[in-house]
Amino acid sequence: EMVALPLLVLDLTGGSAVHLGLIMATRTAPAVVFGLVAGIFADNFDRRLVMLVTKIVVLILSALFVALLITDLLVLWQLYIFTFLRGASMAFDQPARRAIIPSIVPNNLVTNAVALTMGSVQIMRIAGAAGAGLIIGFGSLSAAFGTVVFLYAGAVIFTWFLDVPDHQRQAYRGIRHILTDFNESIRFAWGNATIRGVIIIGIGYAIFGMAFMQVFAPLFAKQVLGIGETGFGFMVSVMGIGGLIGALGLAAVSPTRNRGTLMLGFLAAFGALLVLFSGVTYLNSVVLAFIVVIFLGAGQSLFFPLMNAILVESAPEAMRGRVMGVLSLDRAMTALGGALAGIAAGALGVQLTQIIFGVGCLITAILMYTLYPALRRVQ
């Protein structure tokens, strides 16, 4: 879906960077509305059940979407609605999925577990993206989205059989107390210096870093490097290879000291690599671009698990869902970043805009290291 959706948008809109950015913004915007509520659900209900229900909803939405696509009834406004509803469903999945990890592994292995989770995502990125590129190149977009439906069906089955110990939670007190829980989660997250710092870092990454795969990469593939749908699929796979290497390396080393400084360093490296990638594309060298993409994947897989592990370890068991829900507000910045990336790429060109966004990541890391000592003290 990561490969097929941007290509479908470009196909429906005649290559519009603006619509691509807005679609990706629509996909992540529901996290703004539902993120904190989803965190409350993750703390008040069985997290496995929350994950199961969201996956069933996404499965149904995906099946309806494929039916519209196969029958040639899909139009652009329907695509906006689908991406919003899917984003709303996944907004409830993420806090529960992230908060459930400490219930499965000991505290000293949380970083390893988050890194291995990221590694599994990279394996699917490698296989799924390459497969999507081949399916689209030799088949159709409909076939790619049809494959997604089967994958979600498998996810529903595996989640059903997931054996997770119940977590400490308060009894559900009714809809009236949701606002109280909402305010409590905001006060706790913002009152904790470490959590507040991680959220600010997450906002910077969401605005400047997340737009690469959602907006810039498909534009580079089709409009700059000229490698088309199949090439874009392989680009995502190559990034997955780098991501897998980074995730497995982090899980093997499992740093227990200076994790805050490491997190900021990996974000700075990711920003510098974004600038380098855009610079390499001026040479029109696909090989060099793909080499940089490998390192981009590694940088992302080193930064993101550390950020999540620090966050989840900084919250008590009964608050973890709500804290992860607060982090979901960073997805609002992903929506903003995606929209800005599409608009700016349409006006300034994709290469210059990517350089600007890469510098944004780099500046975020440097400023937080310089001005926010609480993150440097995280071990």
Annotated model-derived regions:
Residues 1-3, 24-40, 46-61, 78-137, ...:
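Substrate-agnostic recognition of the 12-TM MFS/MFS-like secondary transporter fold
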Residues 32-33, 44, 50, 54, ...:
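C-terminal transmembrane bundle of multi-pass solute transporters/carriers
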Residues 19, 75-79, 194, 198, ...:
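Residue-level signature of transmembrane alpha-helical entry/exit and packing/kink sites
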Residues 14, 46, 68-73, 279-283:
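Helix-breaking motifs and short loop linkers at transmembrane-helix boundaries and internal kinks
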Residues 1-29, 187-239:
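Helix-loop boundary and gating motifs at the non-cytosolic
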Residues 99, 103, 145, 149-176, ...:
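Helix-loop junctions on the cytosolic side of multi-pass membrane transporters
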Residues 8, 64-68, 131, 135, ...:
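Residue-level signal for alpha-helical transmembrane segments in multi-pass membrane proteins
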Residues 165-200:
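Juxtamembrane intracellular "pre-TM" segments in multi-pass secondary transporters
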